[in-house]
Amino acid sequence: MEPAFWDASALVPLCVQQIATPSAQAAGKIYSVVVWWATPVEIRSAMARLVRMSLLTPNQHVGAQARLAELRSKWHEISPDPSLRDQAERLLDRFTLKAADALQLAAALAWTSGRPRARAFISRDAQLLEAARQLGFQDLRI
């Protein structure tokens, strides 16, 4: 399986049944998962929001957490460090990104050693995908 950097927005549909779940599952058959260190926090935040909005029952939440644990056991995680933070700050000057998205994109760049050409970046966030594309990633929207 070819590795790809997955944004949290692309992983939530692998944990919770959503419209994007079939697309995420198809991508999961082609690409292994590389993530930023804080991705589990972002996914858990999305799950908690769905519970609060009554879009996810407590039983579904338990199942989603189990699916997240399974994903985590297989993915490769990029750890934070000062150079990654510095890169994220530079990305904020160049692109219209939220702080967490800049950190994700900086982690993706660290994963590719600054050579993203033709490496897949998977997300549901159009702004983040556009920034990734401009940096040279192959952007895959699910």
Regions found by a protein language model. Give the residues of each.
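Short glycine/serine- and small hydrophobic-enriched flexible loop segments
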Residues: 45-52, 109-110
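Alpha-helix capping/helix-boundary segments
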Residues: 10-11, 39, 84, 104, ...
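Short, well-structured N-terminal submotif of metal-dependent ribonuclease cores
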Residues: 1-40, 50-63, 137
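Short active-site oxyanion
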Residues: 1-2, 30-33, 74-76, 115-120
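Short beta-strand scaffold positions
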Residues: 6, 35, 79, 99-102, ...
